[in-house]
Amino acid sequence: MKLNKHYSELNESYLFSTIAHKVAAYQKANPDKDIIRLGIGDVTLPLAKSVTDAMLKAVEEQGKKETFHGYIPSEQGYEFLRSAIQKYYAGHGVELDMAEIFVSDGAKSDLGNLLDLFDVDNTVLVPDPVYPVYVDDNVMAGRKILYMSASAENNFLPMPDDNVHADIVYLCSPNNPTGATYTVDQLKEWVRWAKANNALILFDAAYECFVSEPGLARSIYAVSYTHLRAHETP
């Protein structure tokens, strides 16, 4: 039996765990200091009543013979939920076919599981700084990783370089951790680059609900959807 040698290339601990340990040590040494936390985020408000009511109703249905149900009829998720997602996107000018919508257990899992579709010889392009999951998933698979600087010089929004080739590129907008957000025109440039390089864009839109300024993109699909080379994880 052989272990996956690439696991030894991972950092010793998850970034946010390291930050938590450093914060705890600093607090112990400086109990009178207030700390502004810029590490991993967490919820700060209770769930809306409409959400908790729906959860209670779903649990009650599972306790009655008439409404009990087991596995979801479709591997793509409940149709009523996929339909709601379709309507949500349509409200922002993006038309999606129901067959294109897949409900999973979350974007974090998708970002790793999607990689099973691609050979380990593919080169991956990620922004720097970066959400650690993008890097760790590919390190464990043994893929080559290229970094593109996201700094004040480019407003923390790296743009494609025609001299750089990659097979998979990760874009997060609004970005984690910088908060920078691509415009529709900037994403058009990324789509053009992806087509020219026969590459796939993995677009992490986990924070799109914070976009309110006109001209900023809420979805990669806002860019000429036909023949688009991208997958989005909201």
What are these regions (language model features)?
Residues 65-194, 208-222:
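Conserved core of the PLP fold type I
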Residues 205:
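Walker B catalytic acidic pair
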Residues 196-199:
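A short helix->loop->beta-strand "cap" motif at the edges of active sites that frequently abuts
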Residues 35-37, 145-147, 229:
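Conserved beta-strand scaffold positions in the cores of enzyme catalytic domains, especially
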Residues 2-105, 113:
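N-terminal small-domain helix-loop-helix segment of the aminotransferase-like
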Residues 42, 208, 232:
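Acidic-residue sensor for enzyme active/binding pockets
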Residues 202:
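Generic enzyme active-site microenvironment
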Residues 227-234:
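Single conserved hydrophobic/aromatic residue that forms the stacking wall/gate
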